[in-house]
């Protein structure tokens, strides 16, 4: 049975000559698990919103969308709400009530469900998701993973035929992300619910899906099972080559491999076959760099609580060298965001000491600290935007720079080009994709030219191609003496590009070392490349390192 049938669909946003979607022909069958991927701005979110009438964007539309044989526009609000679920990137935007129980009942109440039937459905879905112990909890007290699970449970209580997810794991740490995707897969396989997911983070989801659909500039360039991806795509398409799971990327470079592994387990088996009877060179681990450094930020003995019931930071201490890219990792609710909020001055320091560039943070005036010394790229970067167009935002950011109008305009143009948003300057900040907004927020921060930049999940919603550009920007900043401190769940990015990695657990910094040592000494919280190859190359933590060592072993 066909859930969605899309015929020759094209769409462009108001005022834009460029198609956001072009000539889309797509059939989505009942019970399929479909992943839609593509670089930022390729049309993923636009396509998903087209499948949900209430969220469909305004603009020039041609073609046809059918849901179970009915045209999309002929669906009543009741039919759409009850049959098509939609999970947003950020669960904060989807929860509307105060407690878990009222959140679960909200959708059912709007559908006019009878009280007895409602109680049964809530009891059933709570048991299925093991929510019984948090039913009376406030939604605001839940972790990111719990909130995302609650949003899903609330939708499933309405018994939909299809559920659409727009980058549902972008706010989650790697372990919470994997657990959430396994839950979604179980729902699809055991209950026949159609699942359509847009994702940049493909490591955990590729092995689960029936089809991988890749968009590029609004057009479908590939639609197949991941194992049937054309080798030519890996050679000719930079996005495919950069964004697939580590085992696929590693072994796509070896002509001896005829079927690419999707998982770490398959990757290990493939590696064993590839290196069978070969002399494997085990590189010696690098010695730690213990040189005395100047510190941009020093925190010592910091304690912090939001409600006086539980300390989020417990005797927290951290030293961040000047001019380095310093990555902070850890699970959701470990205290990472609180730590950088205190170290940047966004939260008031009550207990402990924090020095910024050698001076007590309490001695800084706000006008001296923010902008000139410290800038913060928050996780919810939409809070940085208040103008009607991106161009207005960027011009406002340089008005106080002391530059002439001509110089201001030149700096805005250069920064827009660097962050790849030149073609978006006439757009409203809220009309662009999550990845594009992340790039625009980075442009705002760069225009301020601070000495220390704090970033909270900077690669969230960012495609694999721009991550490389992002890393280059960060390296240039650090080479010029600027310190970049990033909270991140992106283990591959941190392993490849950071200078130091710290791990926060239960409000304390547990370790702080070079990325190679950090990830090679971890067993669970490490990269897929390391998990794939550690039996052969225990110190290799990036795709590049594993590939180079494999090639070296094959030549020996």
Where are these regions (language model features)?
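ABC ATPase nucleotide-binding domains
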Residues: 231-294, 525-556
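Conserved ABC ATPase "signature" region
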Residues: 116-134, 395, 406-424
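Helix-to-loop junction immediately C-terminal to a conserved catalytic motif
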Residues: 52, 344
């Amino acid at each position: 049975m066909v859930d969605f049938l899309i015929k020759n669909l094209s769409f462009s946003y108001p005022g834009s000559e460029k198609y956001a979607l072009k000539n889309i022909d797509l059939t989505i069958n009942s019970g399929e698990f479909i992943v839609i991927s593509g670089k930022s701005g390729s049309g993923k979110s636009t396509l998903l919103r087209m499948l949900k009438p209430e969220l469909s964007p305004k603009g020039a539309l041609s073609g046809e969308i059918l849901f179970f044989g009915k045209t999309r526009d002929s669906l009543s609000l009741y039919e759409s709400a009850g049959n098509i679920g939609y999970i947003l990137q950020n669960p904060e935007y989807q929860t509307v009530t105060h407690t878990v129980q009222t959140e679960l009942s909200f959708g059912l109440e709007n559908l006019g469900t009878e009280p007895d039937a409602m109680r049964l459905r809530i009891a059933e879905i709570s048991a299925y998701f093991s929510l019984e112990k948090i039913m009376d909890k406030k939604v605001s007290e839940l972790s990111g993973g719990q909130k995302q699970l609650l949003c899903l449970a609330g939708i499933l209580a309405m018994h939909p035929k299809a559920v659409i997810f727009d980058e549902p794991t972008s706010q989650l740490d790697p372990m919470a992300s994997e657990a959430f995707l396994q839950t979604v897969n179980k729902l699809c396989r055991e209950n026949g619910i159609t699942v359509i997911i847009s994702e940049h983070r493909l490591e955990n989801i590729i092995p689960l899906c029936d089809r991988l659909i890749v968009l590029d500039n609004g057009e479908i360039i590939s639609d197949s099972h991941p194992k049937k991806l054309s080798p030519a795509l890996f050679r000719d398409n930079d996005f495919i080559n950069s964004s697939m799971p580590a085992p696929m990327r590693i072994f796509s470079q070896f002509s001896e491999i005829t079927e690419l592994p999707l998982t770490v387990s398959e990757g290990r088996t493939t590696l064993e076959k590839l290196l069978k009877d070969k002399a494997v060179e085990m590189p010696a681990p690098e010695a730690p760099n213990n040189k005395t450094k100047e510190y941009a930020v020093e925190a010592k003995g910091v304690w912090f609580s939001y409600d006086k019931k539980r300390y989020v930071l417990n005797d927290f201490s951290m030293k961040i060298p000047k001019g380095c890219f310093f990555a902070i990792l850890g699970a959701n609710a470990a205290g990472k965001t609180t730590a950088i909020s205190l170290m940047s001055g966004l939260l008031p320091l009550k207990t402990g000491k924090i020095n910024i560039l050698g001076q007590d943070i309490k001695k800084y005036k706000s006008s001296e600290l923010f902008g000139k010394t410290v800038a913060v790229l928050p996780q919810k970067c939409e809070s940085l935007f208040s103008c009607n167009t991106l161009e207005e935002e960027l011009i406002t950011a340089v008005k106080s720079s002391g530059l002439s109008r001509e110089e201001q305009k030149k700096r805005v143009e250069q920064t827009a080009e660097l962050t790849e948003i030149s073609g978006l300057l006439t757009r409203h900040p809220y009309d662009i994709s999550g990845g594009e907004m992340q790039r625009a927020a980075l442009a705002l921060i760069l225009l301020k030219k601070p000495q220390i930049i704090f970033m909270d999940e900077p690669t969230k919603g960012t495609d694999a191609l721009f991550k490389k550009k992002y890393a280059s920007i960060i390296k240039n900043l650090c080479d010029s003496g600027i310190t970049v401190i990033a909270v991140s769940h992106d283990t591959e990015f941190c392993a490849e590009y950071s200078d130091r990695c710290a791990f926060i657990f239960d409000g304390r910094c547990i370790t702080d070392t070079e990325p190679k040592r950090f990830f090679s000494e971890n067993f669970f919280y490490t990269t897929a490349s390391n998990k794939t190859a550690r039996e052969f190359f225990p110190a290799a933590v990036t795709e590049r390192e594993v590939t180079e060592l494999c090639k070296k072993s094959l030549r020996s």
